[in-house]
């Protein structure tokens, strides 16, 4: 069945996308896919309440990271890496904080105010909520 959807070009619509999670301190608002991409590309650095955004990611070769970038942001991991490297080497910005595991992602987002990250599915935790974007 998936091969039929893939051949029709519909597979990404039905693919399981990673869940974007935020610390409960992040102000609730509706964000666009462009805003979301800018946050993870480290181009949008401040939440609407004026607090700095803390971005957490997984390694480029992590399957959850690949799924997140492709299905949630409609990009490829190497495109993000290139943008982060360009900002880092030019001194105009920094790369997000890279974590080693999904469990570490959950812990960091849960304990870091204004944090954003992604996981394969939302954990049941009052200090974490899903990020609302269209």
Positions of the model-derived regions?
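Sec-dependent N-terminal signal peptides
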Residues: 1-3
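N-terminal signal peptide c-region/cleavage motif recognized by signal peptidases
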Residues: 10-12
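Exported/periplasmic ABC-transporter solute-binding proteins
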Residues: 18-134
């Amino acid at each position: 069945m998936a091969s039929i959807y893939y051949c029709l070009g519909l597979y990404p619509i039905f693919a399981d996308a990673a869940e974007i999670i935020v610390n409960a301190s992040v102000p609730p608002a509706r964000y666009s896919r462009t805003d979301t991409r800018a946050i993870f590309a480290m181009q949008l650095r401040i939440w609407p309440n004026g607090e700095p955004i803390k971005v957490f990611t997984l390694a480029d070769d992590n399957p959850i990271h690949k799924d997140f970038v492709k299905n949630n942001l409609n990009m490829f991991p190497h495109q993000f890496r290139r943008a982060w490297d360009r900002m880092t080497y030019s001194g105009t910005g920094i790369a997000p904080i890279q974590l080693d595991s999904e469990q570490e992602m959950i812990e960091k987002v849960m304990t870091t105010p204004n944090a954003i990250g992604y996981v394969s599915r939302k954990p049941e935790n009052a200090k974490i909520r899903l990020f609302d974007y269209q």
